[in-house]
Amino acid sequence: MKHLEQRIHALLNADAAATLAGIRRGIEKESLRITTDGTLAQTPHPRALGSALTHPYITTDYSEALLEFITPPSTELHKPIEFLEQLHRYVYSHIGDEVLWVNSMPCMIGKDSDVPVAQYGSSNVGRMKTVYREGLGHRYGRKMQTIAGIHYNFSYPDAFWKLNQQLEGDNAPLQDYISRRYFDLTRNFQRYSWLLVYLFGASPALCASFLAGREHDLLERFDHSLYRPQATSLRMSDLGYQNNAQSSLAISYNNLDEYVSTLTHAINTPEPAYEKMGVKVTDADGNVKYQQLNANILQIENEYYSSIRPKRTIKPGERPTTALQERGVEYIEIRALDLNPFEPVGINQQEIRFLDLFATYCLLRESPQLEKCDLHASKENLRKVVYDGRNTDIQLYNWGKSVSLKNWASEKLTQMQPIAELFDRAHGGNNYAEALAHQQEKVDNPSATPSAQILEQLESRNQGFFQFAMEQALAHRDHFLSGQRCDATNQQLEALAADSLAEQAAGEAADQQSFEEYLADYFHD
């Protein structure tokens, strides 16, 4: 704690606020396309939206029906949400009577085969993306891949890092220092991510169709709905992921080299269950078809599920681990956020401000190496908050001591107050202090959390999860269709759609290698 106070005090004295104004933020938001009767859309990715392979802002995630909206990084606080708004308006003008689902847990889905895998064309890079997704479907089930979320991308400017490095008397090359400090942040994030799940978890219930035929310990209530009375984020649970080969993975976040080597080891280590499944199969017509990229524990880096990732922008054909190793950490991607169904774009400005505070708290707080016992405690804390978090008397593990969620959360938020002061100096006003106070209200009163508000609505209206989610989706559709579209943004998106289709076609025409050769080159060490 002393370490944290000293760092914040030094930053306040050094007038670090000006450097915080250079923070870059970006948002990735996933949404399922659904029909008006609430089932998953079976239509292909609309051509008017451009190529899902090459469009910078509108793409697909696992499924052809799982849209992903991406905002460019910006130093202006309001820009990501404004751009998301415009992307949604544009998409709604090109998807006919389809609707965007606004909950993290999916709509009514029957069989796994009802989930269409995303298609990216005939180029080698496009085929690789589709085969990777086929592999995920065989390994974990397609339904599991339809869960949607918000990813928050965040980076500090070099001026902030240089100031910190100077205050700490560190003489390492700047990029080495930056990478080391981002890993400090990621370790503390794993220790304290339970707090984000409590504050922003918005998936306490789900449609019973999602877990049909699978083991679970949820209660059935309302109309075809499964839930837990005190749950916060079933999206962040291990529901449906029984006997997952990833559960035994120990990816190290202690430093960049260990992270890259443990991740690379998992990508290069065969998994017997996946070997048995086979990489290529021959169909009845004698055609050879890939059903996964390889039979290793992880096909590629992205398969590793984590609530935070250290990232570096990759070059075409480059592996993420190579980019990290050669150029260091550039930004972090926070992946622990549910879609907020009460917000048209799934997130609001106040949440963004708190994420800034939370990430900076994780950076400035002392961050010892994560031992196995620490990882176990972090996972257990997360599990408790996922299933029973709104009982704020539940006991969590804090460095070997037992503490109630309520007391520990309040302590953390109090420790963030001087960080909020720093950010408010950077941006003027007291919006960060207000964002922090709003989170304290949720700790004092669990009924103010999004998860509680969802269950309260199901209870008071005697609705099932599906009816609630559909109502929200239709209300947000009306919001986007009735709002003002920005002509300049609209023209930009129309041009990008055309350019992306041309870029995909050019890539397909330029391919010289066979798919087998392409994969061999890609995975070549």
Swiss-Prot record:
Entry GO CC: cytosol
A Pfam family this chain is assigned to: Glu_cys_ligase
Pathway: Sulfur metabolism; glutathione biosynthesis; glutathione from L-cysteine and L-glutamate: step 1/2
Species this protein is from: Alcanivorax borkumensis (strain ATCC 700651 / DSM 11573 / NCIMB 13689 / SK2)
GO terms classed as biological process: glutathione biosynthetic process
The protein, known as: Glutamate--cysteine ligase
Name of the encoding gene: gshA
Keywords, sorted A to Z: ATP-binding, Glutathione biosynthesis, Ligase, Nucleotide-binding
Endpoints of the signal sequence: none
InterPro entries for this protein: Gln_synth/guanido_kin_cat_dom, Glu_cys_ligase, Glut_cys_ligase
Catalytic activity, reaction form: L-cysteine + L-glutamate + ATP = gamma-L-glutamyl-L-cysteine + ADP + phosphate + H(+)
Family: Belongs to the glutamate--cysteine ligase type 1 family. Type 1 subfamily.
Molecular functions (GO terms): ATP binding; glutamate-cysteine ligase activity; metal ion binding
